[in-house]
Amino acid sequence: MRLRFPMKSAVLAFAIFLVFIPLFSVGIRMIPGRLTAVSATVGNGFDLGSFVEAPEYRNGKECVSQSLNRENFVSSCDASLVHVAMTLDSEYLRGSIAAVHSMLRHASCPENVFFHLIAAEFDPASPRVLSQLVRSTFPSLNFKVYIFREDTVINLISSSIRQALENPLNYARNYLGDILDPCVDRVIYLDSDIIVVDDITKLWNTSLTGSRIIGAPEYCHANFTKYFTSGFWSDPALPGFFSGRKPCYFNTGVMVMDLVRWREGNYREKLETWMQIQKKKRIYDLGSLPPFLLVFAGNVEAIDHRWNQHGLGGDNVRGSCRSLHKGPVSLLHWSGKGKPWVRLDEKRPCPLDHLWEPYDLYEHKIERAKDQSLFGFSSLSELTEDSSFF
């Protein structure tokens, strides 16, 4: 029997849980931020908007502190830290800021997390401007900004079903072994359209067994054939690359990566090889995902689905509202066309977009419509109905 609950009691309780659970987490102390906003306008007049300074999340006594005081330098090479890699650009900046905020808020030891932020060389906002904005929003954050040279990959990119998937920065994950400091042996890669509502250390502690290079939630019930064109499957040789494997779909927006094995196996080159084949013969339509499936599918460390409740941005064409997968949630992912900050500002949010909103540090210039509230639908089951996320 499936119980149905009023939205006001069920989802409000869930939202309150997401907002306040860090206050009761082991080892975390929260110091309120100043109610001031930081903003940046780049030289060409592109306005990045204003962001409110985040509360300061500090380690509690239970944590093994990685620095004795705020002035101490925290090295990007420190293997005792949790290392998270994300991209940083003007278009998705608001999502990246919210993602970082959510991880700090829910981390058991927030000062033990180091963020490796990758910015495009020719973004409307320079890497320096983006770095300054991150520092102003999170004054005590452990992070480093790396510059991604877009000409590294731009000639390998083929057209996709959605223009956003053609952004060169979307391919930065292919080059993490080259971009990040050589001393970084392991990293969690996360897309910018996520929020984490659990302790990121739990994901970090994932073991990559055997010879596996990456770990990610797998979805073996998905129709794997649709990620490649009929030209791929009709080719006499190409489907044979899956021979001896049981390939399953996985989403590359959440991955635990062993960069030592990645570099040793030259996996960047393996991904580039498939991109070169794609330029000669169209074998897929979905941007940076299919090369990862071709190289890794069937040899991925399976991580609990709770760590990538993906597809919340809807499909790649309409961006329609989606429901949650069944089961517990540690990470919500707005993969697909629709992004929560865009839909909220346009006053047409999907129900789950309101779970992203508490982590948004953007200084809002658009007043939320009163009829677009957290209680815009009738039952919790509307959030958890079965639906296709692939």
Swiss-Prot record:
Highest taxon of source: Eukaryota
Matches recorded under InterPro entries: Glyco_trans_8, Glycosyltrans_8_dom-fam, Nucleotide-diphossugar_trans
GO molecular function: polygalacturonate 4-alpha-galacturonosyltransferase activity
Lumenal side, ranges: 32-390
Pathway info: Glycan metabolism; pectin biosynthesis
Keyword Glycosyltransferase on entry: yes
Entries under Pfam families matching the protein: Glyco_transf_8
Transmembrane segments: 11-31
Keyword Cell wall biogenesis/degradation recorded: yes
GO CC terms in record: Golgi apparatus; Golgi membrane
Keywords from the named record: Cell wall biogenesis/degradation, Glycoprotein, Glycosyltransferase, Golgi apparatus, Membrane, Signal-anchor, Transferase, Transmembrane, Transmembrane helix
Subcellular location: Golgi apparatus membrane
UniProt topology in membrane: Single-pass type II membrane protein
Cytoplasmic side: 1-10
GO biological process: cell wall organization; pectin biosynthetic process
E.C. numbers: 2.4.1.-
Positions annotated with a glycan in the UniProt record: N205, N223
Function: May be involved in pectin and/or xylans biosynthesis in cell walls.
Family, similarity comment: Belongs to the glycosyltransferase 8 family.
Name the UniProt record assigns to this protein: Probable galacturonosyltransferase-like 9
Organism from which the protein derives: Arabidopsis thaliana (Mouse-ear cress)
